[in-house]
């Protein structure tokens, strides 16, 4: 039968949720013409948020690249950066990303004990990372190398501090989510939050690897 009937508009074959036949569309679980599932729409919106966040960090990276040599005769990255501590931070954050993925898999299996355990481990690794970062900032400020010392340090504190702020907010999100999971169980909205948190944490890992390479490694060698 033709898609165009009397008094009705033609059906869009590319509409989200429409299959090529009469069965369910594999991406949404709905029949042709049906709406996308809540999981798909939330994940899509969260990816847009992550992309906007990456664009923001791109601006910080660009500013740092321009100002990295503007030390105003003050300390440089080679004078300030302790690669041993930064390597430890990197190991902690990468490991926390792995345990965060395990927490997401455990939540999909509806294993409360495993999900809570891996979320807790993820939070502990993230808190240890943040502690080392705050310790680094405090040491630099005590050595008169604060953000007001030079344009280079302003760009450094802005970039690394923004990432640290994201980690801190992620830890607050993690703690809230653990409480919700304990009280409400594996509701669909809780599972979506665990999935989105895992995406967020992986994105912070990717950004940190870029910071570790472009800021610390290159800065300590120049």
Where are these regions (language model features)?
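...captures the hydrophobic TM-helix bundle architecture rather than a specific catalytic motif
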Residues: 1-222
């Amino acid at each position: 039968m033709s898609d165009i009937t009397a008094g009705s508009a033609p059906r869009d074959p590319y509409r989200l949720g429409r299959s090529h036949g009469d069965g369910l569309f594999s991406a949404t679980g709905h029949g042709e013409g049906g709406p996308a599932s809540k999981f798909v729409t939330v994940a899509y919106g969260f990816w847009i948020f992550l992309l906007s966040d990456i664009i923001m960090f791109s601006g910080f990276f660009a500013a740092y690249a321009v100002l990295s040599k503007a030390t105003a005769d003050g300390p440089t990255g080679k004078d300030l950066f302790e690669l041993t501590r930064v390597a430890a931070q990197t190991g902690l954050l990468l490991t926390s990303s792995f345990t965060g993925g395990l927490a997401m898999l455990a939540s999909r299996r509806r294993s409360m004990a495993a999900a809570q355990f891996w979320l807790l481990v993820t939070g502990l690794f993230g808190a240890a990372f943040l502690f080392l970062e705050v310790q680094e900032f405090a040491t630099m400020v005590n050595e008169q190398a604060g953000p007001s010392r030079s344009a280079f340090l302003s760009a450094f504190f802005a970039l690394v501090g923004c990432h640290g702020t994201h980690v801190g907010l992620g830890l607050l999100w993690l703690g809230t989510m653990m409480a919700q999971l304990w009280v409400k169980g594996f509701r669909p909205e809780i599972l979506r939050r665990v999935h989105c948190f895992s995406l967020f944490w992986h994105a912070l890992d990717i950004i940190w690897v870029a910071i570790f390479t472009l800021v610390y490694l290159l800065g300590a060698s120049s």
